[in-house]
Amino acid sequence: AESSAMKFQRQHMDPEGSPSNSSNYCNVMMIRRNMTQGRCKPVNTFVHESLADVQAVCFQKNVLCKNGQTNCYQSYSRMRITDCRVTSSSKFPNCSYRMSQAQKSIIVACEGDPYVPVHFDASVEPST
């Protein structure tokens, strides 16, 4: 079975990716990463930084998760991300996404040993 850590990497990591060259990025990636099986995943964020940099966030600023759990961490620095949101006209199995790019601080939930990201919680403006 796929571990939570591996699922996080499949759903959220694309270190080499630079979607700027293609408005089709989300449509291709959501299929390639198996997020359109059974339904169109409504929202997904890809992070274009190294796995080491994203894993390091687990040792950065401890913040509350959206669900109230305490194992979320916010990156000190901005990271390059792409948000993919399903379009309102999208009908499974023809999932269609619109893409927006940003450089924001990311918030991830971490667990396990080694302590690694298992859930992408949010992206926010870095706190000052």
Swiss-Prot record:
Query: Which residues catalyse the reaction?
Result: 12, 119
The terms under GO molecular function for this entry are: lyase activity; nucleic acid binding; ribonuclease A activity
SMART domains the record matches: RNAse_Pc (SM00092)
Please give the tissue specificity annotation from the record for this chain: Pancreas.
Q: What is its main location?
A: secreted
The GO annotation for biological process reads: defense response to Gram-positive bacterium
Q: Which residues are glycosylated?
A: 21, 34
- Location of the protein in the cell: Secreted
**Superkingdom in the source lineage:** Eukaryota
Question: Which keywords does UniProt give here?
Answer: Disulfide bond, Endonuclease, Glycoprotein, Hydrolase, Lyase, Nuclease, Secreted
Protein name, as recorded:
Ribonuclease pancreatic B
- Give the organism, scientific name: Cavia porcellus
